């Protein structure tokens, strides 16, 4: 272990006793107070084995004490030192004398720290007095007295430095207040920087003087290095006089706390001055940015407001124009309409139709009414459908005749037939739209309104084109229907002719098939020599293979072979007319037939056997019908279940 660890241990003259743990104490008490009675006699044991006198037992602890008392002094001292070094740090902490500590900590209790500071300014802290009193009691050597005097001087210097720092802190606060009132912030920055540099220099000088006695608790490694490198008289005193170790530790700790407190005050003042300067610069920058943003935002808002106002004015103008047009229309409709609601509806519908016919007159008289009429044209189409449905009612016919003086002929036609009216209305709308487009264009050029009317004219032209296309499609559909009927009649006639021809060809094929069966033997002999086959034979084999797939159980007869040859001829004729069959097919039966025909000629082949009759079951085995079968024996029943509802639910 290192030397500074030993400094914490209090080595005194009266520490001769070896410490005992609680477990060892309990065991020692049990052994010490246990009464030793003689063992009871047992049967079969010899009297010689029993001790004649009761043996007085001595505990191990007492034996160790006796041995240690007999040992020389230097041996048991070394032994005790070894034990102390081997102990864990808990025991050393327990054996340490509690050091002198202040009743407050500088970080948590700032009010107490300020109170102590005011006392230091007036004169001598109570800490110094206590340290002097204790120094007088312990300091017996002249070297220790010198050390105490040096420490008191250093403490006085350290007390002066925080006064300077506090004075500088006040100056920085004053500079901050002046900078807030005055716009010149550069002077305050330079003052704060100079003050911070001075504080740093003072703190460095004070650290150099107090490095010997700074024992920080958080950095024990640094303390070890300082204790090795420093050649202070503390190590000599510790080696010579072990009694003065406690005093030195107490004085050192009190000095550490006072110095640490002063250093903390310095750092606190420096940090405050820096923070104030930084915050002020940030606030000034933010203020400039905010002012710039506000000015830009105000300009943008003004421009936006101007745009919005212009848009609102335009919208209001448009709305006013629309309202005027609507009022004109409503006035005209109200004048023409009767008292009842039904008559008003009819008048509106009829007026919309009249407007289409009278667009020529209206455009010359009222050029502004073109906007409203375009909207009315759309409504007129929707209303025309309603009029067609409502034309069946007799009441509406009478109302329409009263109101529409100019369109008497149209109303009479609508009352007669609704279908004819639809066609006529479409034609009239086309012609009126075309005329209105031309008149609208002329009127818009005269009244300096070319844009709106030209668009309406284009829309009317498109609608007219669509209607004309629909009529053309209807005519084409009728023509196509007539042509399809004619074609279907021709196809039926042709099909009849083809069916007759096929019947005649079948008769010829049957005659040819008989001749072909006789000539097949010669053809197969030639195919065995050359190794090639004609298309008719391949097709015949294909048909046979397909039939064999459908009939796997039964074999073919001689009569069926004639039918297959006839079918092969039919397919050969069809191939000449139209399409050609594929010469290869991947069927298993086809390959087997090819292999057999290649080796053995068909003349030498055995005739196919007749179809076997289906094997009937033997008469001995009689299968009983399920309906006549006796019922199965009943299953063994278990014990009856208790009549509980939850059991039935589970089942």
Curated annotation (Swiss-Prot):
Residues 111-129, 146-173, 196-205, 284-308, 318-331, 338-368, 375-402, 413-441, 448-482, 506-518, 587-607 have a biased composition (Basic and acidic residues). It comes from the Eukaryota. Residues 532-553 are annotated as: 8 X approximate tandem repeats. Residues 271-281 have a biased composition (Low complexity). One of its GO terms (biological process) is acrosome assembly. InterPro entries: CYLC, Cylicin_N. Keywords: Cytoplasm, Cytoskeleton, Developmental protein, Differentiation, Repeat, Spermatogenesis. Transmembrane segments: none annotated. Residues 495-505 have a biased composition (Basic residues). It is found in: Cytoplasm, Cytoskeleton, Perinuclear theca, Calyx; Cytoplasm, Cytoskeleton, Perinuclear theca. Its main location: cytoplasm. Residues 110-241, 267-615 are annotated as: Disordered. The keyword Repeat applies. Signal peptide: none annotated. Sequence repeats lie at residues 278-305, 306-342, 343-379, 380-417, 418-453, 454-491, 492-531, 532-553. Changing residue 459 to N: In SPGFX8; uncertain significance. The keyword Cytoplasm applies. It is linked to Spermatogenic failure, X-linked, 8: A male infertility disorder characterized by a significant reduction in progressive sperm motility, and aberrant sperm morphology. Patient sperm show head and midpiece defects with deformed and detached acrosomes, and flagellar defects. Interacts with proteins of spermatozoa head including ACTL7A, CCIN, FAM209A and SPACA1; the interactions may be necessary for proper acrosome attachment to the nuclear envelope. Plays a role in the establishment of normal sperm morphology during spermatogenesis and is required for acrosome attachment to the nuclear envelope. This is Cylicin-1. It comes from Homo sapiens (Human). The gene is CYLC1.
